[in-house]
Amino acid sequence: STGESQELPVSTRLVFKNDKASGLGVALPAGRVRVFQAETKGDTLIGEAQLRHTANGQSVHLDLAQTFDLNATKKEVKSTLSDDRLSYTETLEFTLSNAKPEPVNITLDDVLPRWQDWEIIESSHDWSQLNAQAIRFNVAVAAGKTSTVRYTVRYRWPSGNKP
């Protein structure tokens, strides 16, 4: 509902291409992958994930673990149903916080669940369409800072399918 913030989980995702340029380029069998970060006092486990069978040339996306120094909240700022009840407009706001000592790039995916006929009529950031009902924002957030993503979507229903 309007005005209430919803906490969203934030996870660390490792994305790479299975090719020779990335130091791979062979078929990778399915199985558990553990990712470590090299540090002066030894390696630190960042997380682990299940890898699916991956052919040479395919992209790999591994969701490693929930991170606690990045936070995200979602809030509906405004919503309006048209007088003829054939369109619904809502403004959503995401607050992305980075408590890390270095800048990060956050990929924010959002689902547009109300209807397949939608249009983004205003947005604070560039976005791309993932599929018929989802969009993606790529947001750079400076170290110790917060960034706000805000967009307005208008859904339209055919006259026989009013909400």
Regions found by a protein language model. Name each.
Residues 1-163:
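Long, intrinsically disordered, low-complexity accessory segments associated with secretion
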